[in-house]
Amino acid sequence: MKSLCLLAIVAVVSAEVYFKEEFNDASWEKRWVQSKHKDDFGAFKLSAGKFFDVESRDQGIQTSQDAKFYSRAAKFDKDFSNKGKTLVIQYTVKHEQGIDCGGGYVKVMRADADLGDFHGETPYNVMFGPDICGPTRRVHVILNYKGENKLIKKEITCKSDELTHLYTLILNSDNTYEVKIDGESAQTGSLEEDWDLLPAKKIKDPDAKKPEDWDEREYIDDAEDAKPEDWEKPEHIPDPDAKKPEDWDDEMDGEWEPPMIDNPEYKGEWKPKQIKNPAYKGKWIHPEIENPEYTPDDELYSYESWGAIGFDLWQVKSGTIFDNIIITDSVEEAEAHAAETFDKLKTVEKEKKEKADEETRKAEEEARKKAEEEKEAKKDDDEEEKEEEEGHDEL
């Protein structure tokens, strides 16, 4: 046990933190560049939201204007490559407004990104985080490979409540990855298998063709089966119980014809019975060959330059709070950071929100009861007034 603890301590001590932002005070505005790409971007403000533990620790930057694009980014202290290393991108998101449509993701870019002109088309290495619009609730993990943005093929569902949630992306040097939500694994796999970064290893043989005599019919008509002689019956017949109305005039109404009814003896279209096809060979499978266009890449995970992170978002309803950003080469360091920030907030925040929700529910219930009582009292008053008027009229 002591050895394991020592290893954990050594891992954290030797870890490199490339970027950390906790938005503890107003100085964040000096570090985060407001894009000038357009002049009507939405504004971020410093806020811990409605429910928090320690305000200075739990505050982050919050979107503050509805139906706005947001574009703000920050540089790292130095440019670095993650070749041969693990890379961890981690931050918290709280959709306090009960978001209906809007992004909550980050874009992590090269060091040469122009933050003053940061916008939706600015190249990035990785885009990661939750995105919600209507019923769609997904975690984006988009990797840029050779100039093209590639979406993960697996579905990862994000959280959509009004509490703070921790999102973690881990890129490993063996071309594997893991996405965590609130410290729990949400998806793992291979970069090559879960993204279309490389051409397929195998393709259908263009020279292969299904043989002309290949029979894929598992069952065929029984050639010896014959239709019974009494099979053919009309689908509809005249109703034998129908009688011509007594007032029917053939000259005026035309010749009377009984209505048609379904024929109980009708058997439908005859089809011969099916038997096993003795020539059946199964479903023909197109043979595959090695794809000459495929070349393995052991460095799908690796980018030569990392140097900036930004929020490039659209939100219909504002109120999302971002906080506790860390980019490091150590999973242990990211976990330690979460323990000092997210873990200390989540329980208190949930308890306070549940208490507030219960108080709101009780207040609404009391208001409803009061409205019903007032309605009933008014009804009684109206009835008394009506009775008095009727008594006055009798006098």
UniProtKB/Swiss-Prot annotation:
PANTHER family: CALRETICULIN (PTHR11073:SF2), CALRETICULIN AND CALNEXIN (PTHR11073)
Region of interest (4 X approximate repeats), ranges: 186-250
Taxonomic classification: Eukaryota, Metazoa, Ecdysozoa, Nematoda, Chromadorea
PROSITE patterns hit by this protein: CALRETICULIN_1, CALRETICULIN_2, CALRETICULIN_REPEAT, ER_TARGET
Induction comment: By ER stress in an xbp-1-dependent manner. By aging.
Signal peptide boundaries: 1-15
InterPro entries according to UniProt: Calret/calnex, Calret/calnex_CS, Calreticulin, Calreticulin/calnexin_P_dom_sf, ConA-like_dom_sf
Gene Ontology biological-process annotations: defecation; determination of adult lifespan; endoplasmic reticulum calcium ion homeostasis; endoplasmic reticulum unfolded protein response; ERAD pathway; hemidesmosome assembly; IRE1-mediated unfolded protein response; multicellular organismal reproductive process
Main location: endoplasmic reticulum
Compositional bias of kind Acidic residues: 213-224, 381-395
GO cellular component terms given for this protein: cytoplasm; endoplasmic reticulum lumen; endoplasmic reticulum membrane
Changes after translation: Cleaved by caspase ced-3 in vitro.
Cited Pfam families: Calreticulin (PF00262)
Family: Belongs to the calreticulin family.
Subcellular location: Endoplasmic reticulum lumen
Residue ranges, annotated region (3 X approximate repeats): 254-292
Residue ranges of the region described as Disordered: 202-255, 340-395
Knockout-associated phenotype: RNAi-mediated knockdown in a vab-10(e698) mutant background causes 45 percent embryonic lethality. In the surviving animals, causes a 14 percent larval lethality associated with the detachment of muscles from the epidermis.
Ranges for the Sequence repeats: 186-197, 205-216, 222-233, 239-250, 254-264, 268-278, 282-292
Name recorded for this polypeptide: Calreticulin
Organism annotation: Caenorhabditis elegans
